[in-house]
Amino acid sequence: MPKQVKGLLGEKLGMTQVFDESGRVIPVTVVRAGPCVVTQVRTPDRDGYSAVQLGYGAVDPRRVNKPLAGHFRAAGVTPRRYLAEVRTGDAAEYTVGQEVTVEIFTPGQRVDVAGVSKGKGFAGLMKRHNFRGLPDSHGTERKHRSPGSIGACATPGRVFKGLRMAGRMGGRRVTVQNLAVQAVKPEENLLLLQGAVPGPNGGLVYVRTAAKGKANRDGGAA
């Protein structure tokens, strides 16, 4: 049976904490997820695979290019700022124009969250790769945060590919797996997810059913 995957686009609002039944403090990230609208349904017969395309976020129609404007017009929905595709085996159960809300998730369920990590700009080795650096004394002069040797002269006579060096840090798509859904608040379109998710407050995130199927806290499979 094809795997059924649920997914939503949303916005990271920030972090807070909640208390469980035993009074234990649990750090959670608050995500405003959806509502999303189905803008296209892909089928194996027509497209070669089964998926649902979701639209999220308001956008000025004047800022939508003509191909996308025609796409939204054909679907009969107002233009959306973001589009994402969810590959799922039950795509045929969706209809174009249908609204998808946070109610597709349940407390205790495990989800994966993808987003773009905070950009740190050009960073050195100690910040980017957690290098120790050179000694603070014993003759070290203006080289305390340098990498040290990156290769010998004649052998190998070059710098190996993939060597950890300074460079741009952050600003990349990151997926955090198997976060537990602590609470679902449909009236506010909010998800409370245990732990941290990538990106800054206000950043776009994609929440979907956990790919690795870790067991729920109540014993069922995610």
UniProtKB/Swiss-Prot annotation:
Annotated PROSITE patterns: RIBOSOMAL_L3
Cited SUPFAM superfamilies: Translation proteins (SSF50447)
Recorded GO CC terms: cytosolic large ribosomal subunit
Molecular function, one GO term: structural constituent of ribosome
Top-rank taxon: Bacteria
Keywords: Ribonucleoprotein, Ribosomal protein, RNA-binding, rRNA-binding
Record-linked InterPro entries: Ribosomal_uL3, Ribosomal_uL3_bac/org-type, Ribosomal_uL3_CS, Transl_B-barrel_sf
Pfam family for this entry, one: Ribosomal_L3
GO biological process: translation
Matches recorded under PANTHER family: 50S RIBOSOMAL PROTEIN L3, LARGE RIBOSOMAL SUBUNIT PROTEIN UL3C
Subunit structure and binding partners: Part of the 50S ribosomal subunit. Forms a cluster with proteins L14 and L19.
Family that this chain belongs to: Belongs to the universal ribosomal protein uL3 family.
Name of the protein: Large ribosomal subunit protein uL3
Source organism of the structure: Acidothermus cellulolyticus (strain ATCC 43068 / DSM 8971 / 11B)
